[in-house]
Amino acid sequence: MITERQRQILNLIVSLYAKDHTPIGSKSLLDSIQASSATIRNDMKALERLGLIQKEHTSSGRIPSVSGYKYFVENVIQLEEFSQNDLFKVMKAFDGDFYRLSDLFKTAAKSLSELTGLTSFVLNAPQRDQQLVSFEMVMLDNHSVLSVITLGTGEVRTNQFILPKSMTEADLAVFSNLVKERLVGKKVIDIHYTLRTEIPQIVQRYFKVTSEVLQLFESIFDDLFKEHLTVAGHKNIFDYATDNLAELYKLFSDDERMLHEIREITNNDEMRAVKFDNDEKFMKNLTIISQKFVIPYRGFGTLTVVGPVEMDYQRTLSVLDLVAKVLTMKLSDYYRYLDGNHYEISK
């Protein structure tokens, strides 16, 4: 346990070091701490013994340690009001109407990346507990078909595809009835199971060429089973990482691995999570920060940034909080739009 003055000193060292990455000496703290230079030096020695700050080899000053950053984020930091400049930039980015959920997430990821200078990720809420409430298929012409899936949240998914050569319009009607009888009313997680157990056997009874029918099932429903990760700021790693660039770039391009990292640190009820001690050797000097945001009627999505341990946590957390609030506001508008019997067209 550290004293209140030591807490103030740690706060100042972290904040000052984030600005110019210069080791901090006791004289730099005199104007902000009501104590003598000797008292401040003693408190700095106490913080050093606790492993919260450390000596920089080329200077007599001190810099925050990984443990110091962790303590700062968990016990010291207090979120300040976001700056008017940041608020203007985020509101401008989200200005206008959004008709696709993916566009909202892309805007959020880009805003996070540009304002923090870090690599950012946006994760949608899991869809496994959503219910399929209706399914329709519409012939657009002799060859093109539009499938329309409606979920319990009011969200509508559409998928345009070319009718397989082996299928007639009569076959399409049978297909549609199968979906309505076997899948409508079920949760997404149960649909996933049914498609892999019951449906292949049923398809054999109704269709001569089963492979194309099963592929059609997969084409229409596969997107429901995926967690979608939106990424921005890949190139920012060149600004904050000097080692293992290839490994980092590979990680940030691998949705499954990043999903694992994000899920690992957000697997609790906390709205915000910070991971300092990463098992991956090439990420030992990096920090992962995730913050949940509300998705109306669906639960929580996650905003994540990855950056250097010595990042400006005060600003980064403030920007995360700002983007989360604006994104939730725009998501509310988006779902009101869907409630007006509109739906987005999937590419």
Swiss-Prot record:
GO terms for molecular function: DNA binding. It comes from the Bacteria. Gene3D superfamilies: 3.30.450.40, Heat-inducible transcription repressor hrca homolog, domain 3, Winged helix-like DNA-binding domain superfamily/Winged helix DNA-binding domain. The keyword Transcription regulation applies. One of its GO terms (biological process) is negative regulation of DNA-templated transcription. SUPFAM superfamilies: GAF domain-like (SSF55781), Winged helix' DNA-binding domain (SSF46785). InterPro entries: GAF-like_dom_sf, HrcA, HrcA_C, WH-like_DNA-bd_sf, WH_DNA-bd_sf, WHTH_HrcA_DNA-bd, WHTH_transcript_rep_HrcA_IDD. Coiled coil: none annotated. Keywords: Repressor, Stress response, Transcription, Transcription regulation. PANTHER family: HEAT-INDUCIBLE TRANSCRIPTION REPRESSOR HRCA. Negative regulator of class I heat shock genes (grpE-dnaK-dnaJ and groELS operons). Prevents heat-shock induction of these operons. Belongs to the HrcA family. HAMAP family: HrcA. This is Heat-inducible transcription repressor HrcA. It comes from Lactococcus lactis subsp. cremoris (strain MG1363). The lineage of its organism: Bacteria, Bacillati, Bacillota, Bacilli, Lactobacillales. The gene is hrcA.
